[in-house]
């Protein structure tokens, strides 16, 4: 499904650059609901990876920009690659929730 040789049509920012943007962006946490409940970055909305990949049109609008986060940045990078190929404006959060140094919401 994904090739390491394909061009990335999305950008990435570090989890450490996210603080000033919280509350001003659409932040989507694509981890499973049990992971999200264990703790998530403030303002993040949970839409599991499988759901967003199977039916992006149910959750996303192609005229808006979304920041995608997971635990480490790997799932979010794969998701961004797919969604950008479908015409969605997405930004990967590298480092993910696991690298977030401030308190997580529960």
Please tell me what each predicted stretch does.
Residues 1-16, 21-25, 33-65, 71-106:
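Rhodanese-like catalytic fold shared by cysteine-dependent sulfurtransferases
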């Amino acid at each position: 499904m994904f090739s390491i040789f394909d061009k990335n049509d999305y950008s990435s920012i570090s989890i450490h650059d996210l603080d000033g943007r919280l509350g001003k962006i659409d932040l989507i946490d694509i981890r499973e609901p049990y992971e999200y409940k264990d703790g998530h970055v403030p303002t993040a909305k949970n839409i599991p990876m499988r759901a967003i990949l199977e039916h992006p049109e149910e959750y996303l609008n192609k005229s808006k920009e979304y920041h995608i986060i997971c635990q480490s940045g790997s799932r979010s990078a794969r998701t961004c690659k797919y969604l950008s190929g479908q015409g969605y404006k997405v930004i990967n959060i590298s480092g993910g929730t696991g690298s977030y140094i401030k308190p997580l919401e529960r």
